Amino acid sequence: MAIETKSKINSLLMNIIPGGILFSEGLKKQGYSDQLMKQYRKSGWLTSLSKGVMYRSGDSLSALAALASCQEQTGKQYRVAAHSALELSGYYHFVPMGKPHLMVASNEPRTPQWAKSDFFDMTIEFFTTSAFGLIQKQAIKQNNYTVQASSPELAFMECLLLAPNRYNFMDLYYIMEQLTALRPAKVQQLLETTNNMTVKRMFLYMAEKANYPWYKAIDVSRINIGTSKIQLCKGGVYVSKYKITIPRELAEYE
């Protein structure tokens, strides 16, 4: 019995994503009982992170590896999103003040308890939204694992959705200046299916201002931007074409 237990823990430790975490619900499906997992913790092989979640004792926890572990073991529809997804796609490097944040989009209202831990290399920040009728995802290969993330087109729109509370519009335009290779068909799909008028109008305004070739391939006549005025800031500049009041700094930037 002891030999079997050691063989199972060796197999488990060999297959865990470096820096990742383990979910008891996934382990049970692989034949690991609650009693066996308790024995692994008692023996010091595994350490509890939160209820039903463990990691290999002594590991430095990676937020990305943990998210990949969750996607793989539980099937949760979490994905790397917003500026974090843009970083993974190589489009943008966000320089944080203090500990970096990993933005995660979820279809569940609550942040899982394990994601609130301070043990990760990044602060994991969850958000939920029903603004996008079409979710464009991509699988991004990391060192020893693959993680699901928003497409670059969706990721930038997620940034716009979270502005101005999470992001500054001027900073987002600096990102737009790097998005030289967005795919117009993907952009078209997202703009036609999102129900958020601010996202539609600000994306179109910024894309037109940047004057990329891909913008010229978008059929704006198929995109409903609504009729009501939107004020994004006080003391800004009103853009009549898109019926939005934007920061003066952005309007005057060339």
State where each predicted segment sits.
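Short linear loop/turn motifs
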Residues: 42-44, 55, 99-105, 222-223
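Long, compositionally biased
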Residues: 67-72, 119, 207-211
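Short beta-edge/loop segments at beta->alpha junctions of small alpha/beta modules
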Residues: 1-83, 180-195, 199
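Exposed, interaction-prone assembly regions rather than primary DNA-binding/catalytic cores
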Residues: 82, 86-139
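Hydrophobic alpha-helical interaction segments
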Residues: 30, 136-254
